[in-house]
């Protein structure tokens, strides 16, 4: 496993990937401590939570920034590449807690600002909002499996010119309609937490 808190280890990892694969074509920034930092503070106001809760959430933004900074030069040199920040509707409306929302808003802004600085290079940066997940630790009714977001990223990567989408917030359900894919279950997620629901 890679310790994203170790900057040198991250650099070594990226260089190893470049050496083995030649270059990085797609980067998906999805590292987040998740329920481990969110669940213990559910129902508590921001002023009732330890300050460390904010840092635990915001570490995801630093990791995304660091990985993007390391792979972007190769993408720019190749005049091709896609950076995807996995975010959430929590970046646009209140969901779970203040630190959760601030972190996802920052992930969205990171994609938007990177896209501005990448304009004209052939490299796109987007923010992707999956819906409520069905995983080994969560199960929103009629939610999305992780494969659904994976298929959204694959569809984007295969689409070619993404200049019109770069800097935007994209929703897995909307991309499924646009590119014609379904979830691993064979269904189109329709739960109340489906990406974009209520936004």
Predicted regions and their residues:
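C-terminal helical subdomain
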Residues: 62, 120, 127-128, 140-199
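Catalytic loop of short-chain dehydrogenase/reductase
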Residues: 33-37, 45-53, 57-60, 76, ...
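A glycine-rich helix->loop->beta "capping" turn
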Residues: 16-29, 35, 66, 124
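Short, flexible, mixed-charge acidic loops at enzyme active sites
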Residues: 39-46, 183-188
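Hydrophobic pocket-lining residues within nucleotide cofactor-binding pockets
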Residues: 2-6, 133, 175
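Generic structural signal for alpha-helix termini and adjacent loop/cap motifs
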Residues: 20, 78, 159-162
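The beta1-alpha1 cofactor-binding region of Rossmann-like NAD(H)/NADP(H)-dependent oxidoreductases
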Residues: 1-13, 51
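A short, exposed helix-loop element centered on a Lys and neighboring polar residues
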Residues: 68-69, 112
């Amino acid at each position: 496993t890679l310790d994203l808190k170790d900057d040198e280890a991250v650099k070594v990892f990226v260089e190893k990937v470049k050496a083995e694969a030649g270059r990085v074509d797609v980067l998906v920034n999805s590292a987040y401590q998740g329920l481990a930092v969110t669940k213990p503070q559910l129902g508590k106001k921001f002023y009732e939570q330890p300050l460390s809760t904010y840092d635990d959430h915001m570490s995801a933004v630093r990791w995304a920034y660091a990985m993007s900074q390391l792979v972007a030069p190769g993408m720019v040199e190749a005049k091709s590449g896609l950076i995807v920040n996995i975010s959430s509707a929590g970046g646009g409306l209140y969901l779970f807690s203040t630190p959760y929302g601030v972190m996802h808003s920052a992930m969205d802004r990171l994609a938007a600002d990177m896209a501005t600085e990448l304009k004209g290079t052939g490299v796109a940066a987007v923010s992707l909002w999956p819906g409520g997940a069905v995983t080994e630790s969560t199960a929103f009714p009629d939610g999305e499996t992780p494969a659904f977001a994976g298929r959204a990223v694959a569809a984007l990567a295969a689409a070619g010119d993404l200049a019109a989408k770069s800097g935007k917030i994209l929703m897995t359900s909307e991309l499924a309609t646009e590119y014609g894919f379904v979830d691993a279950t064979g269904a189109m997620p329709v739960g109340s937490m489906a990406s974009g629901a209520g936004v």
